[in-house]
């Protein structure tokens, strides 16, 4: 059985297992870009044919370690970092719902998220029904459609 670590230990140790001669703690990578020897190598990264770091806004070792720590703390299988809650909302919904799909959401969500769902994602073909957080089970059930993908 795998050893269960306390949250404090996971915060410090999860996501990084140093090899001989490597630092105990992963350094913070402050670079925006990463070096490759040829433009072909970069092209393969941009085309998602190869994996690796090439632009920090997309991925870097520091972000990967933070995601691994969050994953360990939450007991998950993977985690993804975003630059904002709005981006997290977009990714969460758009990975579940496609053009022609439907989602049920609370009517009392953050205004920017309401706008993202009611306007922007509607333009992308995802329809939303907003229900009161105090709605009954019957009212919630009535909001569902055959193409509802998420609540």
Task: Give the label of every model feature segment.
Residues 91-94, 112-120:
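Hydrophobic alpha-helical segments in the ANL/AMP-binding
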Residues 55-56, 81-82, 106-107, 129-133:
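Glycine- and other small-residue-rich loops at beta-strand/loop junctions that grip anionic moieties
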Residues 1-29:
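Short conserved active-site loop signatures built around small residues
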Residues 38-87, 115-119:
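Conserved N-terminal alpha-helix of the aminotransferase class I/II PLP-enzyme fold
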Residues 73-77, 97-100, 145-146:
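Short helix-loop-beta connector
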Residues 115-151:
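PLP-dependent aminotransferase-class I/II
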Residues 95-113, 132:
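Conserved PLP-anchoring active-site segment centered on the Schiff-base-forming lysine
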């Amino acid at each position: 059985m795998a050893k269960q670590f306390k949250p404090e230990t996971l915060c410090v140790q999860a996501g990084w297992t140093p090899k001989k001669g490597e630092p105990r703690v992963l350094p913070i990578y402050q670079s925006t870009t990463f070096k490759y020897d040829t433009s072909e190598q970069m092209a393969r990264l941009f085309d998602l044919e190869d994996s690796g770091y090439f632009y920090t806004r997309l991925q870097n070792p520091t972000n990967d370690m933070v995601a691994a720590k969050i994953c360990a703390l939450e007991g998950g299988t993977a985690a993804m970092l975003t630059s904002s809650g709005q981006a997290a909302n977009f990714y969460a919904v758009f990975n579940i719902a496609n053009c022609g799909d439907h989602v049920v959401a609370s009517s009392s969500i953050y205004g920017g998220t309401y706008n993202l769902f009611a306007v922007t994602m509607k333009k992308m073909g995802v329809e939303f029904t907003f229900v009161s957080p105090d709605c009954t089970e019957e009212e919630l059930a009535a909001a569902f459609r055959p193409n509802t993908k998420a609540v």
